[in-house]
Amino acid sequence: MSSSTAVPGQSPIAETAPLSLCAREPHVPADRLVAEMVPPPRFDTVRFDTYVPDPKQPSQREAVDVLSGFAAGLGGAHASGSARRRWFARKAAAPAAPLGVYLDGGYGVGKTHLLASLWHATPAAPALKAFGTFVELTNLVGALGFQQTVKTLSGHRLLCIDEFELDDPGDTVLVSSLLSRLVEEGVALAATSNTLPGKLGEGRFAAADFLREIQGLSAHFRPLRIDGEDYRHRGLPEAPAPFTDEQVTRAAYATEGASLDDFPSLLAHLARVHPSRYGALTDDLRAVCLTEVRAVPDQATALRLVVLADRLYDREVPVLASGVPFDKLFSDEMLNGGYRKKYFRAISRLTALARDAKGLVAQ
């Protein structure tokens, strides 16, 4: 008996079925959350000298120079030592300079590359440096509790927070309190976002307590603006148009370690899995194949999809899809609302992953 199914005139589909994200319900213990607070695989090997500043954007070279000096100033017994204070003294005349740096810029200008390079360049053992997204940091607090998180991170020289965008007043108060405690313990901070610290949460919440927390949070950082075009698409061909359901299905069966799900079912499954587990959801995947991609129906669903897109991008997992193109995932209302920066980042990252997946389809 044949071990494959064939369509006349086309190559056979292997009998072994692809994986399914919808069949996965990962459990992530707290110790894994702590152990994984390192730069993701995409940024394992990045360094300051592998960042290529755009000569038309002097802010990019300035950011490399400033961050290199910041990393050098974190040597010594602890991040609260005099070396760090001297570094900030050279940069600002204020008597109480901020104890962190904040990389603000558009999509794809290399902020995460620079943040990971800072982590790698800081002269401390990996166990004394932490790197994670804002979502991962709040998940860590949820898993360990506030006091234990302070205790776990207070001995670190550096905490790097990627994608620092505050969408919830409760998270704002939580993280502001956490960072204030860590600063008191001498932990240096570095963060990236598409929004300056003083503007975090703008247009989303107007409560006085929320605004007060934002102002207190911004005082911990020295902003560094990084200008430039999205490097993920710089000089590259356009992302491929969506494929057919049949092409995506065949590619999933032909690619070892690929998953295959229809998009509506995946969105429903994401609602049942905590975002802290989305990274584990993609463990050992070589490609994600999606059929029936369509515009997301509501903001809660869209925000969950953003987190999944970030985890796939971090892990360099190609995404092959049929249906609507990724730049049509979010409505005009979403792209003009308070979460628009998240949505544009997701479009940029998914487009890059779609380009990576093009070779999975037989020509």
Regions found by a protein language model. Name each.
Residues 1-91, 219, 225:
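A short, basic N-terminal segment
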